[in-house]
């Protein structure tokens, strides 16, 4: 949607890293070049024995989206979707925290800030970094941080974010 494409447009001016809890590939399809998936990726299959080993991942395609019962990964274990199930560790959380710790601008889109551990990433934002939250719903924000809240749907909020970050931009 326009929100995804708007984030891609920001890559022309900023070093953008997307950290997402979504398991779809919409950011990649829109053209984002650096995406960290906290909860895995629906279009990847992995080893049930070693799910976080990218050498054992298989990329699924629209032509081949099913994993059949009994299908094996390269290490001989059962093949499974590369999705973080309830109760499993979030393998990319440390990588995400390191990226957040380098941010000059941190943008939260479509989050209640209630789902942990992802909601805790805001604690890693450096002092002095600008923080924006885009969500049409009222969200309780941490009182110890200055957060600019844009109560808008994602597409409209990203457009407004671009206006604020790139006031001279004429592509809006």
What is each residue range found by the language model?
Residues 1-172:
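Conserved catalytic alpha/beta core of Sir2/sirtuin-type deacylases, generalized to analogous enzyme cores
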């Amino acid at each position: 949607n326009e929100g995804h494409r708007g984030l891609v447009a920001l890559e022309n001016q900023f070093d953008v890293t997307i950290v997402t809890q979504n398991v779809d590939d919409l950011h990649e399809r829109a053209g984002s070049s650096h995406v960290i998936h906290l909860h895995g990726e629906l279009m990847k299959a992995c080893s049930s024995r070693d799910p976080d080993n990218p050498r054992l991942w298989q990329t699924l395609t629209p032509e081949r989206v099913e994993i059949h019962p009994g299908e094996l990964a390269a290490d001989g274990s059962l093949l499974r979707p590369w999705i973080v199930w309830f109760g499993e560790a979030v393998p990319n959380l440390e990588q995400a925290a390191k990226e957040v710790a380098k941010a000059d601008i941190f943008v939260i889109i479509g989050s209640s800030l209630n789902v942990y551990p992802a909601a805790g990433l805001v604690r890693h934002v450096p002092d002095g970094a600008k923080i924006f939250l885009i969500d049409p719903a009222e969200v309780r924000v941490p009182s110890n941080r200055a957060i600019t809240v844009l109560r808008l749907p994602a597409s409209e909020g990203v457009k407004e974010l671009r206006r604020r970050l790139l006031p001279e931009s004429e592509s809006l």
